[in-house]
Each structure stands twice: as structure tokens, then as C-alpha cells.
Amino acid sequence: MSAAGSAPVAAPAAPVPSARPHTVRPVPIDELAAVLTTEDHPFDVDHATAVTGVTLRASDVHPGDLFAALPGARAHGADFAAEALARGVAAVLTDPEGARRLPPDAALPVLVHPRPRAVLGAVAAHVYGDPTADLGVIGITGTSGKTTVAHLVEAGLAAAGRTTGMLGTVGIRIDGRPLPSAFTTPEAPDLQALFAVMREAGVADVVMEVSSHALALGRVAGTRFAVGAFTNLSQDHLDFHNDMDEYFAAKATLFDGRAEHAVVCVDDIWGARLAARVPAAVTVATTGASADWRAADVGTDADGGQHFTALTPDGPVPVRLQLPGSFNVANALVALASLAAVGVPAGLAAERFAEVAVPGRMQRIDVGQPFLAVVDYAHKPAAVAALLDTLRAQVPGRLITVLGCGGDRDRGKRPLMGAAAAQRSDVLVVTDDNPRSERPADIRAAMLAGALDEPGHGELHEIGDRRAAIVAAVDAARPGDAVVVAGKGHETGQEVAGVRHPFDDAVELAAAIRGVITGVLGAAR
């Protein structure tokens, strides 16, 4: 290591599974205008046009679409109206500035709204027939744990024999079938179209991760939630939100009447604060706080998993997880309480939990090496601390951590992540994550500054090349140690200066281990 109203019509053909429903009812433009009309913003549109889809990307316009021309950071969507017209757009939704930018010869109806993004979700939901009225949507929000809770809920719904859709960080699935990854973080029109696709496919319930960005930017507007679930809150996304209070306020909007049921983990002060704002919420706790759902008799299994007893309103339920860490006990309780809210008994759901593994979340890599190797998505200070604390309790030897921070994101968390990792690692290798448009060395320097400020920190190394950093960590490992590669988890690419390069931590870690094993065997021969 180196130191330092009408009959349905067929929608345009698309790949199966489709990102749009196969059939839609043409919606007259005056009907859409009525959806948008308020006392402050009346609409009076006299036009025979009907809409059969919604998009905010001119390049994705299908004939009959409503094109949402929204203002952006670099350009206004209305500047691309000519392309939308060439593709057969039926109508435009935009703001006053967008209306001024439209081609003067654009002979089509234009709906002008002062905040078109705020109403886009409701418009798209109406065009696609209000799909979530027919779906049980379970929305999960929080800084950490959303993906794990989503996978556990999906497993519980499957145990109950219910056809399920899932939207989250690791992708989108309909009854187990993946959809293209480009739709992993859907904008409002894409989201409502996906819900309609799921309804067509016979889906009964949808599990959805709900980010603070999705809430603040109106991406889930027009969505009816059967359950809103809150896991926890810690520092992240302060490049988007001004402070933690604003970050919390964005998360809390999921519980402002959008969800029929609320489930809140009160293990941190933010959860307790949210529960106080939502008196009808079902509460979950693992820390001794008073709650409707609690955990008891938590123990570790020989294979690294764990077990506990869920103390539910209907009595105790035994739970086993292959996922280690106290935070996953909380995640499992949130999942069980959310499932109970939609009629799935905790005992039935818990039977499936032991089978759940989540890509890039405490993912073990085993190719026969005499040390533990783990890939995890931890990319915020609290998550790094929780990950390493969990592994420290399991590992007799040293903790060797490979960690970086993403560029063009919350800069304030970089020294905090460096400190959290340095405090808990015997060896910390600071490397690149997704630098994006930033200078990678600057990101590493911020992390190292935090690490160096941590009293009693372990060995510190800086290796910018992530592949080389992983190889160096593996090369340093001895029997009984643990090598932890954190920050990217399930991701299969690394974003550098506008280019996405193929890179998978799990693949790279396995390859590095095989290389070391082969080298050792070769030397022995």
C-alpha cells in the first residue's frame, strides 16, 4: 500500500415488460384542464385533443402525449418543443416562461401553470387512470434501511401469495421480473405509467422506496399510499436540503395524509419527533423505547445471521435473519408492522425473512479465503459506523476498510465518513467512489482530514484507483481479518468526469481474492 371517457386504444408498441401500459383511455384536454383548475388558477380550454400518455422528455414523446416542458438547471424543456412536435405531441404543460419559448406556429393546446412540476404527478395519474387506487402501495422512507425493508416486505407479500411490484435503489421488478434500470428513479409521469403497467400485470401490492428528493420534487404526487413507513434519519443529502430540519420536513411529507397507515421507527430522535406529529402511527423500537412493536431476545447465529423475538400487538413472533446488525432488527420490525397494516400476519411473513439477502447490503463474498470479505452500500457517516460496529463484533482479527465518497453530493459528510471509518478500522484505505465532475483527490483529501483528526485512528492509506485499493486491502488480509468494501454496494458502474465505467465491487473483491489465493498457491508450488 502507498501511504497518506372514450374507449381504450392501444398504446405505442414497447418492449415487454413495458414502461407504459398497453391500453389507455384517451383523456380529453378539457378534462385535464379541470384537474388543474383551482380558484387561483382557472383553466378554460376548448379543444378536441385527447391525451394518451405523459412525458417530460421530448425524446420520449409518443403520438398523443402531453409534453411537460419544465424549467431546468441548464435549459428549459420548452426549448425542445420542436422535437416533441415532430414526434406527435398532442398538448403541452408548462410555466409562463415555457409558454413564451414555444414555437409560434405550434398549433396545439398549451396548459400553463405557475408550478407545473407540482401538478405533474396528479396529471399523469389521471391520464393513466389513477392506478394506485387499485394498488396497495407501501412507501418506505428514511436515510438508511429503505432497500432492506423493501426486500423484506416483498418477501412477506410473496409468503401471503400476493403478486407484488417493487421500485427501489437496486431496480424495479414486477412479480419478480426486472424492468430496465433506466427507470430506477422514476419521474412522476414514469412512476404513474409504471403503476399502470403493474396494475395491468395483476399486481396487488407495490413496495416502493421513497427518497426525500422524490418527495420534495413532487415525483410521488398523485400516488395513494396504503402505508408510509419511516426507518431513521441521519446526515445525508445536505447538498440538496439546507439542513437536517429541512431534510426531515421533506421526509415527513409522506405522512401528511398521503398514507392510510403510518409505521414509524422511534429508535432515533427524528422518529420520535415524527411519531409525535402523527398520533395514529404504529411505532417500532429496538432501543427500549415504548412502542407498539418491539424486539426481545436478540442473538447472533453461528453463520453470522441473527434471531430475535418480535413482540407484536398479537403476541410474540420468532424471527430469523441472515442479515447481521442491530439496524436490521429495526428494519425487520418496520417490515413486519408495514405488512400487518396491509393484512399479512407477522408469523407468516417472518417465515420468509430468513431467505432474504439484499444485493450490496452486508453482502458476503466467499471464494474460499480464510478471512471475511463484505461489500456494503454504506455511504453516509451513521451507516459506515453501524456497518463497522456490526463487523467488529463478529471478527477476531483486524478490520480493513476500503471507502470513498461520491462527488457532486453532500460535501459536509466526507470528513465525518473518514472519521467514522478511521475510528473503527485497523486499516483504512481511502479511495475513489463516484467522483463525477469533481477532482477525486479533493474528495479523498476531505475524507483523510476527518480520519486524521480522529484520535487513535488506525493505519491510513490513500489509493485513488478503486480496483488497486481493493487488491491492496485483500493482499494485506490475514486469517481472521475482515475486508470491507463500502460505499457503492450493488452499483455496477463508476462515474468519472461524465463517463460511467463498468465497475462492480462484489466482482472486483472476488477477483482480488482469487488473485491472491492463486498467487499464494503458485508461490507454494
Which ranges hold each PLM region?
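N-terminal leader/targeting and accessory segments in enzymes
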Residues: 1-122, 296, 324, 358, ...
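Residue-level signal for inorganic ion chemistry
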Residues: 32, 65, 84, 123, ...
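Active-site beta-alpha connecting loops in nucleotide-dependent enzymes
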Residues: 72-75, 358, 384-455, 465-466, ...
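Glycine/aspartate-rich loop-and-adjacent alpha/beta segment that forms the canonical ThDP
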Residues: 482-515
